[in-house]
Amino acid sequence: MQSILILRVTFKRQFFSDTSRSKSSAGMISTWQSAYKPYLNRLIGVSHKSTLKLNEELLVKILLSYKENTRSRQQCGIALSALARHIKLELPKNWKQLQSGYGIHESNFRKLPSDEEIINSFQLIPNPKWRFVFGLMATYGLRNHEVFFSDLSCLKKGGDKILRVFPNTKTGEHQVWPFHPEWVGLFELENISDTLDLLPVIKTDLKETTLQHIGRRVSEQFRRYKISFTPYDLRHAWAVRTILIGLPNTVAAKMMGHSVSIHTKTYHHWITRRDQQIAVDSALSRVKY
């Protein structure tokens, strides 16, 4: 038990020394808190209750304790494989199969809100500041916390409406275009001035809070206003929107602040369908009836 606790300390030190993981310290803290710490805590808890040593068998036991085809299962696999590399422990050859890939499959996509549902839900929010948050997330596909760490000056009259997300966010600085562009007006995002306090007052000093905690505040407000979908559903819906209009995957991934590989894996179903539709349309255009 003691050795695993010590190992977590050394692994954490190594994690934060690897600057390639994130472009910002706040992003690294958020990633550690949400994507590594919970799984290491479970490892420590299970090892404490059992006689298993830190070996392949124990890591497999932890991985299989999460439901198959879930984000938790996938992230647990990523965290434990990083730990295994740290201590030079060989994992079973079928680890990736056990980890079970996570993506938004067709069944999950059916649960995403339609444009009409998004517009109707906007009207349910009585507080204009939280309504503004909702509109930004729907129009720009932002992560929960990114709303509070973005340059909104682009929304002023005459601005280009291209939002810049600040470097101190989870995946660093990136620019985002609105999809749909007309939602900037529909959600009243351009009614801003230098003196207008647009966003809800929450603690955003990252010396006193975390990106994860800020994100939770947004989720809490969605539940409070009885929005029938989650904040991340708005982000996924934005991604699907860009796919269906034909925006290149590389461009959409950059706007979302993640890698192309994550983008294509997460949205595989819709990307495949788009590419097939393009091929079918091209073939049909050459057929003479």
Task: Kindly give the residue locations of the regions a language model identified.
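N-terminal DNA-binding recognition helix of tyrosine site-specific recombinases/integrases
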Residues: A35-V46, E56-E57, K61-Q99, R143-H145
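Short, aromatic/basic-rich helix-turn unit that serves as a nucleic-acid recognition element
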Residues: L7-Y39
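Catalytic-site neighborhood detector that most strongly recognizes the C-terminal catalytic loop/helix
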Residues: N168-T171, M256-D281
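Active-site-proximal segment of tyrosine recombinases
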Residues: E146-V147, F229-T230, A239, G246-H258
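Short, polar N-cap/turn motifs at the start of nucleic acid-interacting alpha helices
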Residues: L155-G159, L247-T266
